[in-house]
Curated annotation (Swiss-Prot):
Gene name per UniProt: dbp4
Biological classification of the source: Eukaryota, Fungi, Dikarya, Ascomycota, Pezizomycotina
SUPFAM superfamilies: P-loop containing nucleoside triphosphate hydrolases (SSF52540)
GO biological process assignments: rRNA processing
Protein name (Swiss-Prot/TrEMBL): ATP-dependent RNA helicase dbp4
Record-listed E.C. numbers: 3.6.4.13
Naturally occurring in which organism (per UniProt): Neosartorya fischeri (strain ATCC 1020 / DSM 3700 / CBS 544.65 / FGSC A1164 / JCM 1740 / NRRL 181 / WB 181) (Aspergillus fischerianus)
Length: 810
């Protein structure tokens, strides 16, 4: 029988009431903690984490991570968040906002005794993947002694693996896009019990870029929750706060009364740089600061790739990296890690690295392109001068951007000074870029995309007081990128649309074959807006317009006021009159003298009735005159348009990278400047004689070398033949037996004195195929003939000789 169940006895037995006492002690500590939080005075100033009512796991995690002193934003925001109030936190970059919301998240869930089966308790949204990873790493450090399960949900990872684990998470750090994907697709993931919602860089998340995504996420969340919003440039819009269902939020802005919105130890400067000189000045700056850590911000990923690839080919003498949103998540994380660990490096980046990321010891922040607003500028320069450290920032401004941008920065309390670039320090890389684009088509393609993306980024900006596209020198900017010409951009049309719309009918018909009149153009545009995306063949049939001779003839018959032009009436005749609708142009009687002839007036009228001629200017010197349908078809054939285009010019580059034409001819003045014609002739002849003599010496040396090689080959062949002949002579052959034996049956003295071969003779073997070919096609008899029996044996080796001697002696 099995032993009776009973209490454990022995050395390792626990006291019977140990678990009960431990549970009671934990409940007492929890009750004491809740009471301390309720008694917390919000007006009190806290200087260290030990002054706050924190749980033992949180306090131990902060101490292990060496967090002791509170910053201003942490001192004021944590106390309000511990009370369960909604908080809007605003502070300068690098002031410790991450801990200001992570500590309340851990404490509030701990006081509610949150467990794995309770579901998701806190959701932390971040605008970028890199910032989400950074928040998650800090959460792991300070929450190492808690029993909560935390997860990181960002794009670029396996969705299936995240779905399997998502239902067991208590705290999630995520980006909006991937979070919405899980809310829509993951069946076991539910947020009905959510307690806290945190938005880091809240103004960016609530911006238009994430508007639909964030609205959809909020629709899945319960309204009864605590919400924390933190950013260096906090939003106060009523619409944004209403979307989040905030309840009496506490606005905590510790630096609102400060004289500057940026860190005090940050030195900020700007440089007036024309657009075509930006890359030259950036290259000169990098070459002058090889022992520093620099971040360079550009407006688009295409620009980042082009500047990185071109500077990488030029080899400035410092490691280069690039970061943009089109890279895969593994590569982005690797670049962020490498840049954080580097001491001397340059990182070209878009605004994906402008918010929240903590890169240690960044010396310079360069903004090559003007930021879209003052808030973006503040976040960019916030990558340096963090945690009371020093830093420097430089902003590149085009002359057209200076006035508007300085006004916006002044409104945000950003102190900035103007500096000038020393001319002797500036280096031009225009020729090198042109040479690289000429040799590398991929780099040229990147340059074209970089140009287009920059122009588009300027075009879509809202603040037209800063961004004035028409004042930018785009052709010179394209040349500074190494491009042969400025790429064509579709959306840059200027005032051509308005001019075409207000032009008369005939002029509009000549300018474009697609736009026939003002009214028809307006009707066509309205139809395009109203028509559905899917159009049947019947829709196309009814919308088809006559684009042949009748349409052109009709446009000539119609005046601008909508009246018909009759042959015998003035321009004021009504188009609806039946008498003028059909009329005979001219009548000839039989035998009339004028039959078959035309007067000068008729010729003039026919010339006036002819279609107006269009002239198309192509790149060449000869314009294309379009006076018929056949000539108009030439525009569709590239091969036939070649004769109207000028001949191309080919450029060659010297060793220094300077471009030259393939054939460069001197003019008369340059020829005379070099001296007298006879002197130049004598000099030319002397140079040619010397060049011919040197070439002759080279030819003789080559011929001599060839003769020497030929002689060596011949001698080597002779040596091979001589060696083969010596091997054949070493074969041993004996004369036939003549019975010259002595009485004892041995060999004669002459045989004994015969010289032995100097070396073992070479045995030659024949291939099986050779033996088969040597045999005749008929079978030989197995019985040996008498002649073959009496023939002396063939001796080839020393063994054969010994066997022969044994036979003779025996």
């Amino acid at each position: 029988m099995a032993p009776a169940a009973g209490p454990r006895t022995g050395k390792h037995a626990k006291p019977p009431r140990s678990k009960t006492l431990k549970r009671k002690r934990g409940q007492d500590e929890l009750s004491s903690l809740i009471q301390r939080v309720e008694d917390l005075d919000l007006k009190e100033t806290f200087k260290s984490f030990s002054d706050l009512p924190l749980s033992e796991p949180t306090a131990s995690g902060l101490a292990s991570s060496h967090y002791k002193t509170l910053t201003d934003i942490q001192s004021r925001a944590i106390s309000h968040a511990l009370k369960g109030r909604d908080v809007l936190g605003a502070a300068k970059t690098g002031s410790g906002k991450t801990l200001a919301f992570l500590v309340p998240v851990l404490e509030n869930l701990y006081r509610k005794q949150w467990a794995e089966h309770d579901g998701l308790g806190a959701l932390i949204l971040s605008p970028t993947r890199e910032l989400a990873i950074q928040i998650f790493e800090v959460l792991r450090k300070i929450g190492r002694y808690h029993t909560f399960s935390a997860g990181l949900v960002i794009g670029g990872k396996s969705l299936k693996e995240e779905q399997e684990r998502l239902g067991r998470m208590n705290i999630l750090v995520c980006t909006p896009g991937r979070m919405l994907q899980h809310l829509d697709q993951t069946a076991l993931f539910d947020t009905y019990n959510l307690q806290m919602l945190v938005l880091d860089e809240a103004d960016r998340i609530l911006d238009l870029g994430f508007q639909q995504t964030v609205d959809a996420i909020i629709g899945h969340l319960p309204k009864e929750r605590q919400t924390l919003l933190f950013s260096a440039t906090q939003t106060k819009k009523v619409s944004d706060l209403a979307r989040l269902s905030l309840q009496d939020p506490e606005y905590v802005a510790v630096h609102e009364t400060a004289s500057s919105a940026t860190p005090s130890k940050l030195q900020q400067h700007y440089v007036i740089t024309p657009l075509p000189q930006k890359l030259d000045i950036l290259w000169s700056f990098i070459r002058s600061n090889l022992k520093s850590k620099t971040m360079v911000f550009l407006s688009s990923g295409k620009q980042v790739r082009f500047v990185y690839e071109s500077f990488r080919h030029l080899q400035p003498g410092i490691p280069l990296m690039h970061l943009h949103g089109r890279q895969k998540q593994g590569g982005r994380l690797d670049i962020v890690t490498r840049f954080s660990q580097s001491k001397h490096c340059v990182l070209f980046s878009t605004d994906v690295a402008a918010r929240g990321l903590d890169f240690p010891a960044v010396d310079w922040v360069i903004q090559l392109d003007c930021p879209e607003d003052a808030d973006t500028y503040i976040h960019r320069v916030g990558r340096t001068a963090r945690y009371e450290r020093e830093g420097r920032a430089v902003l590149f401004l085009d002359p057209s951007e200076e006035e508007g941008m300085l006004k916006r920065l002044e409104q945000k309390k950003v102190p900035i000074e103007k500096i000038n670039i020393k001319a002797n320090k500036q280096q031009s890389i225009k020729d090198q870029l042109q040479n690289m684009c000429f040799k590398d088509p991929e780099l040229k393609y990147l340059g074209q995309k970089a140009f287009i993306s920059y122009v588009k980024s300027v075009y879509i900006q809202k603040d037209k007081e800063i961004f004035k596209l028409k004042e930018l020198k785009l052709d010179e900017f394209a040349a500074s990128l190494g491009l042969p010409g400025a790429p064509r951009i579709k959306f840059i049309k200027g005032d051509d649309t308005k001019q075409r719309k207000n032009a008369p009918r005939a002029a509009a018909h000549l300018l474009s074959d697609d736009d026939d009149s003002d009214e028809e153009d307006g009707e066509k545009k309205s139809k395009k807006k109203e028509e559905p995306q899917v159009r049947t063949k019947y829709d196309r049939m009814f919308e088809r317009r006559n684009q042949d001779v009748l349409a052109e003839h009709y446009s000539k018959l119609i005046n601008d006021d909508g009246t018909m032009v009759a042959p015998n009436a003035g321009a004021g005749a009504d188009a609806d009159e039946d008498d003028d609708f059909l009329s005979v142009k001219r009548r000839f009687d039989a035998g009339d003298k004028d039959l078959g002839s035309s007067s000068d007036e008729d010729d003039e009228s026919e010339k006036g009735d002819k279609k107006d001629v269009k002239v198309v200017h192509i790149d060449g010197s000869t314009p294309l005159v379009i006076d018929s349908k056949r000539r108009e078809k030439l525009l569709k054939s590239k091969k036939k348009l070649l004769k109207f285009k000028g001949k191309g010019t080919k450029l060659v580059y010297d060793d220094e990278g300077n471009p030259h034409e393939l054939y460069e001819l001197e003019d008369e003045e340059q020829f005379k400047a070099r001296g007298d014609a006879k002197d130049q002739q004598a000099k030319f002849l002397a140079e040619e004689v010397e060049r011919t003599r040197m070439a002759d010496m080279e030819d003789k040396e080559i011929a001599k070398q060839k003769r020497r090689e030929k002689k060596e080959k011949r001698k080597a062949r002779e040596r091979e033949l001589l060696a083969e002949a010596e091997e054949e002579e070493t074969l041993v052959q004996l004369p036939p037996y003549e019975g010259d034996q002595d009485v004892d049956g041995g060999f004669s003295a002459s045989e004994d004195e015969a010289p032995r071969p100097s070396k073992k003779p070479k045995v030659k073997f024949t291939e099986a195929n050779d033996r088969e070919e040597a045999e005749p096609w008929y079978k030989k008899s197995k019985k040996p003939s008498d002649k073959a029996a009496n023939a002396p044996p063939q001796v080839q080796t020393l063994e054969d000789l010994e066997s022969l001697a044994t036979g003779l002696l025996g």
